[in-house]
A protein has these predicted regions:
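N-terminal core-binding DNA-recognition domain of tyrosine recombinases/integrases
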Residues: 4-7, 24-38, 44-122
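A detector for short, charged/polar N-terminal pre-domain segments
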Residues: 10-20
Length: 122
């Protein structure tokens, strides 16, 4: 997909769009980028998990770095389901990728995930 086609594909998404509908468009972008079906499934599930953590229908433009960090903290300490360091690292990558894509195509002015610290797995 050319940059022009990618920009056109996000033209229906705005700062007021909730995360879930935007994720559906992002899924096609990931596929066009040659990501494997397993990667796409995991990345989409990770971002949808963030969406389910946030207030219902939270607009993309209202998501903050603080909320993303709270989500990741909850993921590690309060979710009640173990989250391995490798899984946590992938979830951070997924969220960063999603918001970077939105920022790259002008949907959001500020990328709230840019300042989220990537946790490496050794």
């Amino acid at each position: 997909m050319s940059p022009e086609q990618s920009a056109e594909s996000v033209s229906h998404i705005s700062t007021n769009t909730p995360i879930a509908p935007a994720v559906n468009t992002w899924r096609y972008y990931l596929d066009d980028q040659g990501k494997s079906p397993h990667t796409i499934k995991a990345f989409v599930a990770d971002v949808l998990m963030l969406a389910s953590y946030l207030p219902p229908d939270r607009p993309l433009g209202d998501v903050s770095t603080h909320e993303i960090n709270n989500f990741l903290d909850w993921m590690q300490k309060n979710r009640g389901v173990p989250c391995s360091p490798k899984t946590l690292s992938r979830r951070i990558t997924s969220i960063k990728s999603f918001f970077r894509w939105l920022h790259q195509y002008g949907v959001i002015l500020v990328d709230p995930a840019e300042r989220v610290v990537q946790q490496s797995v050794i």
